[in-house]
Amino acid sequence: MFGPFKLTSPVAGGLLWKIPWRMSTHQKTRQRERLRNVDQVIKQLTLGLHVQRCQDKGLTYQEAMESKKKYKPRSKSLRLLNKPSVFPKENQMSSKDKYWTFDKKAVGYRKGIHKVPKWTKISIRKAPKFF
């Protein structure tokens, strides 16, 4: 109770999490930058696969870059990443989707994305359908 061995909240209830309830402006800036970086990687992958398919057909790199028709990736997962309805770009997302995520246990069914474990390593872009 008193003295050198008094009870503290981490000792009493286990690990004390100290996550603020809102994201700082610096966290939001870095989150937007991460979203833009992912968009850039997807764009480069799509462009590289387009150039590869053009070169398979006998076109040069310059002709492939200047062609008006862009070939879509053959893999279904990459085609889905290019669809805005499935994986929107950073500038197409609302601020609610950038910084908040769906949580069925939360009061308003939303929680800050910074409370998701490993939130800097995953890309959460869409809320569930009809939400």
Curated annotation (Swiss-Prot):
Domain of life (superkingdom): Eukaryota
InterPro entries: Ribosomal_mL60
MF-aspect GO terms: structural constituent of ribosome
Any one cellular-component term (Gene Ontology): mitochondrial large ribosomal subunit
GO biological process, one term: mitochondrial translation
Transit peptide is among the record's keywords: yes
Keywords of the record: Mitochondrion, Ribonucleoprotein, Ribosomal protein, Transit peptide
Transit peptide: 1-12
Subcellular location, record wording: Mitochondrion
PANTHER family per UniProt: 54S RIBOSOMAL PROTEIN L31, MITOCHONDRIAL, LARGE RIBOSOMAL SUBUNIT PROTEIN ML60
Task performed by this protein: Component of the mitochondrial ribosome (mitoribosome), a dedicated translation machinery responsible for the synthesis of mitochondrial genome-encoded proteins, including at least some of the essential transmembrane subunits of the mitochondrial respiratory chain. The mitoribosomes are attached to the mitochondrial inner membrane and translation products are cotranslationally integrated into the membrane.
Family, similarity comment: Belongs to the mitochondrion-specific ribosomal protein mL60 family.
Quaternary structure (record): Component of the mitochondrial large ribosomal subunit (mt-LSU). Mature yeast 74S mitochondrial ribosomes consist of a small (37S) and a large (54S) subunit. The 37S small subunit contains a 15S ribosomal RNA (15S mt-rRNA) and 34 different proteins. The 54S large subunit contains a 21S rRNA (21S mt-rRNA) and 46 different proteins.
Additional facts recorded: Present with 2100 molecules/cell in log phase SD medium.
Name of the protein: Large ribosomal subunit protein mL60
Source organism per UniProt: Saccharomyces cerevisiae (strain ATCC 204508 / S288c) (Baker's yeast)
Gene symbol of the encoding locus: MRPL31
